[in-house]
Amino acid sequence: MALAPTMKALTFSADDETSLEKAVTEALSGSVDLNMGLRRCAAFPAENTGAFLCELTTKETKSFIGKFSDKVRGRVFIDHAVIHMMYIPVILNTTHAIAELKLKNLATGDELYGGTKVNLNKAFILTMTWPRSLFAEAVHNHKGLYLGGTVSCASSVPAHAKIGMWYPIWSEKVSIKQLYQNTIDIHKTEAIETFTPTMISSDKEMRSLLRSRASIDVAAKTREKPVICSERVSLLDQHTQGVDFTVTEIEPEKDDDAGTSILGPKMVPIEQVPSVKLSSEAGRNLLTA
């Protein structure tokens, strides 16, 4: 004969429920500072390591619900109505890098946005939501909502190289009420690259910058030939011409048939040493001989 499973029936007490609700209300009275909407709660590098995982819960919230009794934690919920994932790369837009992302509730195994792929060579913000509440006790036991993914890069990117920064931003609310919303499609907003401003706005600034390191002590303003002379110069061509005052010459008169000459001084050049012309084949620089 098969044995029927034994189960202990739940029994309720109105007084116990009233007392528990009062305890929950008192516990949540200090959550005003926590429920302040969106906050940038984290920042961590995107690395070429294959996978990453981050828990979407702040230390402040964990510390807050850690003070609750087990009964109170079982009646308190944590909501993440809005989740943003911002990314800014340090790699160039010509470097191949892709990430595949998803959200997962570890307590229930539910997943959202699985298969979402983004290029990690561009800056963007992803907008998501988790349309249901999380039990505070599950969050306290590290079984809350997690954002994770895998990263794959080009073979030229070294392993464990930091290729950018992740900035997860989410809303976090501790409440006695439960969130019940429809699931929205993931939305991506891509940033447009900015432009480099003008660094030098005039020739004067550029000239001053260049002159701070470039020498102009020996320089011509326009293009000049560095040497203007013959291709070959004799070292013995220069000499001083003398005058021989002992020689006279008679210049003939116009009507004199005999051709009488008047003697006068005559310029006589000094004997020159005949120069030897070198052939082009045998020529060499005398200054370096």
From Swiss-Prot:
GO cellular component, one term: host cell plasmodesma
Example of a GO biological process term: transport of virus in host, cell to cell
Keyword Transport attached: yes
InterPro entries in the record: Bromo_MP
Role of this protein: Transports viral genome to neighboring plant cells directly through plasmosdesmata, without any budding. The movement protein allows efficient cell to cell propagation, by bypassing the host cell wall barrier. Acts by forming a tubular structure at the host plasmodesmata, enlarging it enough to allow free passage of virion capsids.
Family designation: Belongs to the ilarvirus movement protein family.
Protein name: Movement protein
Lineage of source species: Viruses, Riboviria, Orthornavirae, Kitrinoviricota, Alsuviricetes
